[in-house]
């Protein structure tokens, strides 16, 4: 999962700073690298490994001055975690200057790369975004028109692809026809922002305009915003994990408050899996909203049982298991005064590998808790994701090879319960959701054809 940004602002000195602030607001979507590309007669770029605040300084904004800007924060799915895979990707061709920032993952990456290499194109990275950049360049040369080039690009790609792009001074945002990853547009003074989540618009003091609908592009050219249909969107497969974990709670995605959705997940979970206990607590930060919902519905008080060290990154999006193990030990500490001698309901948003959950339960027990009852605000994750979440194989997913009872014994809980799939969908409906979610990691049924997997397409 990554975060993408596109900015147009008539003040070319301000535009790259707005991109920086937007990326800072989307830092939760990727912490490995960050990059900004701007256009002012030609494309200038700065990319680096690390957090947004570690990559950029004031001198960079002078270098990046330009009215049209895109940006990216990354965590890797296709392509290793190294500088050459940091985005945006820039291409200079007969079609002009192109830059691409991509959130998603291509299922047919290898096939497309082989075809382009057979045509004589040279690749310098193992990122699927470089494939997208090369294809866009090829189609722009052949078509001479942005809309036609985007139509051909869409016909070529299989998987998830929400993107912001620079084609010379035009800023473009595009969302694939299934709408896997979010994208929205806002107004800032006399300019515009295109971004992965509405929280970035709020951070800039902007005005939300609308979500980019699946299969449509938002194109900003000469200061004018236009929405253009690129492909039919007959069905949707919005990533359910946006509402469970990835998105910031203060964001609104496709008209659904992420906070409301998570709160409803907690409430439905309390109805499905009640337990006698003294208080409800959360695994911070992503489990807090569901835990509050659980407490409200159950009538139990809510207390902090764990305190998070906010200078440690999100363990799930760290690329190497050994780093996740170390990060858990540094990430949270137990409030012994609250848990000692008491029965705790511990709520988390999800369990992927189980690294964090197992250690946290042990920490709470070691601190003197009488009982620990774990409640999970989503169903068991049993299948890999091929669309941009770092869950590559069933072997790394604890629920793919263990029953709920077995997982509870591994964690050392007194009880463990997950939200049902029906309960999850009910919660999203209560928050305003209507239709069309990708549930593949929970059901093993995929919305597009993936070799070796069952398809609902």
Curated annotation (Swiss-Prot):
Note on cofactor: Binds 1 Mg(2+) ion per subunit. Binds 1 [4Fe-4S] cluster per subunit.
Residues noted as binding [4Fe-4S] cluster in the record, renumbered to the chain: 239, 385, 438, 441
Keyword Magnesium: yes
Enzyme class, first EC level, given as a word: transferase
Single Gene Ontology BP annotation: 'de novo' IMP biosynthetic process
SS bonds (residue pairs): none
Any Pfam family: GATase_6
Keywords annotated in UniProt: 4Fe-4S, Glutamine amidotransferase, Glycosyltransferase, Iron, Iron-sulfur, Magnesium, Metal-binding, Purine biosynthesis, Transferase
EC number from the UniProt entry: 2.4.2.14
Catalytic activity: 5-phospho-beta-D-ribosylamine + L-glutamate + diphosphate = 5-phospho-alpha-D-ribose 1-diphosphate + L-glutamine + H2O
Binding positions for Mg(2+) per the UniProt entry: 286, 348-349
NCBIfam families reported for this sequence: purF
Family per record: In the C-terminal section; belongs to the purine/pyrimidine phosphoribosyltransferase family.
Identification of the protein by name: Amidophosphoribosyltransferase
């Amino acid at each position: 999962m990554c975060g993408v940004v596109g900015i147009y602002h008539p003040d070319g000195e301000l535009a790259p700073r707005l991109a920086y602030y937007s990326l800072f607001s989307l830092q939760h979507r990727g912490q490995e690298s960050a990059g900004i590309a701007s256009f002012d007669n030609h494309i200038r770029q700065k990319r680096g490994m690390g957090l947004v605040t570690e990559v950029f300084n004031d001198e960079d904004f002078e270098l990046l001055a330009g009215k049209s800007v895109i940006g990216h924060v990354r965590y890797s799915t296709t392509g290793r975690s190294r500088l050459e895979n940091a985005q945006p990707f820039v291409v200079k061709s007969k079609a002009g200057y192109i830059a691409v920032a991509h959130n998603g993952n291509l299922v047919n990456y290898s096939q497309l790369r082989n075809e382009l290499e057979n045509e004589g194109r040279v690749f310098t990275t193992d990122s699927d975004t470089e494939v997208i950049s090369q294809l866009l360049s090829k189609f722009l040369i052949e078509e001479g028109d942005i809309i036609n080039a985007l139509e051909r690009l869409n016909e070529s790609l299989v998987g998830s692809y929400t993107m912001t792009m620079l084609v010379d001074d035009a800023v473009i945002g595009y969302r694939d026809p299934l709408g896997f990853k979010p994208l929205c547009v806002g107004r800032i003074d006399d300019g515009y922002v295109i971004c992965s989540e509405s929280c970035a618009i709020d951070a800039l003091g902007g005005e939300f305009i609308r979500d980019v609908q699946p299969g449509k592009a938002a194109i900003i050219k000469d200061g004018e915003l236009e929405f253009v249909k690129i492909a039919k969107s007959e069905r949707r497969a919005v990533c359910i994990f946006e509402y469970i974990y990835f998105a910031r709670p203060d964001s609104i995605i496709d008209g659904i408050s992420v906070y409301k959705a998570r709160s409803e997940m907690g409430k439905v979970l309390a109805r499905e899996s009640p337990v006698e206990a003294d208080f409800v607590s959360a695994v911070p930060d992503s489990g807090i909203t569901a835990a509050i919902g659980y407490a409200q519905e159950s009538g139990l008080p809510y207390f902090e049982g764990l305190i998070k060290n906010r200078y440690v990154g999100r363990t799930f999006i760290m690329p190497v298991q050994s780093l996740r193990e170390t990060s858990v030990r540094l990430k949270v500490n137990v409030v012994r005064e609250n848990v000692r001698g008491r029965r705790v309901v511990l709520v988390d948003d999800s369990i992927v590998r189980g690294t964090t959950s197992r250690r946290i339960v042990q920490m709470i027990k070691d601190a003197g808790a009488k009982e620990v009852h774990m409640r999970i605000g989503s169903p068991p994750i049993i299948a890999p994701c091929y669309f941009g979440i770092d869950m590559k194989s069933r072997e790394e997913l604890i629920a793919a090879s263990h029953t709920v009872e077995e997982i509870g014994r591994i964690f050392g809980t007194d009880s463990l319960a997950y939200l049902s799939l029906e309960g999850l969908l009910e919660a999203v409906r209560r928050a305003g959701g209507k239709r069309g979610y990708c549930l593949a990691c929970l059901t093993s049924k995929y919305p597009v054809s993936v070799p070796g997997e069952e398809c609902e397409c």
